[in-house]
Design a protein with these regions (language model features):
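Compositionally biased regions
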Residues: 16, 34-36
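Gly/Pro-enriched, hydrophobic low-complexity segments
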Residues: 30, 85, 110-114, 132, ...
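Short secondary-structure junctions and interdomain/linker hinges
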Residues: 16, 70-74, 182
Length: 281
């Protein structure tokens, strides 16, 4: 089934070309809310069945099933940037090891240089569900390894998502959640993209656009790249609506998965702070 996943994306270009060319007609004129963000009406089941999102949603569901059945673990370099408040942060890069069952994550910070060498480990069902992490330099030697709530303010400082939501599988989960929401409403535009590249690797992609800001939608535009050889999502971009009419959309978050190596045979030792290859104090 894994070999068919990218074909599903490409095949839907023909089957959905007419639908994807423009938004669905809303059932009635949207009403403006007091916040200035408009609201639209719920679409009928008949509209949902022909919704531009449906091929993407079906693909994401199949992709998640493929990952669950065939990808036990992987390593990757993730290059990302996020908008925290009104500020778009600089790119940062991390090396990660991820095991899906039980969910186990090891993170080593590569950049920025001021944080290089920081490490974090999370293992589902262990360490009281806490993230284990350490900083570097004098503070790292003095404080040592700390246990943090993954969703607490300290661990979340400077991040949009907790460590428990890191990874390729979560990109599928997010796409499914967004799609399940959006198929209830009209005005989604979907385009399928080919000839893309990430780190010199050929990719296929999909782009979803909501032209008008409405309370029902969580984004203005998103783009997802799928590595044609790995058959895995490797890039995700999400944008908010322009602040001024005619202005550029605002990047909210971007994640690039590079040098992905799957099924490495990771063991508990790869997610143990006592591993002698790691730098936990």
């Amino acid at each position: 089934m894994a070999q068919d996943l990218v074909r599903i994306l490409l095949a839907t270009v023909l089957s959905c070309a007419v639908v994807a060319a423009g938004p669905l007609a809303p059932a009635q004129q949207p009403a403006a809310s007091s916040s200035g963000v408009e609201q639209t009406t719920w679409t009928s089941p008949a509209v949902q069945s022909g919704h531009p999102w449906m091929p993407v949603l079906r693909w994401a569901q199949q992709e998640q099933a493929m990952i669950d059945g065939n990808v036990r673990d992987y390593s990757a370099t993730i290059v990302s940037r996020e908008r925290i408040g009104d500020k778009l942060e600089e790119y940062q890069s991390i090396f990660v090891k991820v095991r899906h069952r039980p969910l186990s994550i090891y993170v080593y910070v590569l950049t920025p240089e001021s944080h290089k060498g920081e490490e974090a480990i999370y293992v589902e069902g262990r360490n009281d569900e806490k993230l284990l992490g350490h900083t570097t330099g004098i503070a790292g030697r003095v404080v040592g390894t700390v246990a943090l709530d993954p969703q607490g303010s300290t661990a979340m400082n400077g991040h949009l998502h907790p460590i428990t939501e890191l990874g390729i599988r979560h990109l599928c989960q997010r796409l499914i959640a967004l799609g399940n929401n959006d198929v209830q409403f009209a005005e989604s535009q979907v385009r399928f993209l080919s000839g893309l590249k990430l780190n010199d690797r050929r990719c296929t992609g999909v782009e979803v656009i909501h032209p008008v800001p409405r309370t029902n939608f969580q984004f203005h535009r998103l783009r997802l790249f799928v590595d044609e050889q790995l058959k895995l999502p490797v890039r995700y971009e999400q944008y908010d609506w322009p602040r001024q009419p005619g202005g550029p959309p605002e990047l909210v978050e971007e994640y690039n998965f590079m040098n992905v190596q799957i099924n490495n045979g990771f063991t508990d030792a790869d997610f143990d702070p006592r591993n002698p290859r790691y730098g936990f104090p």
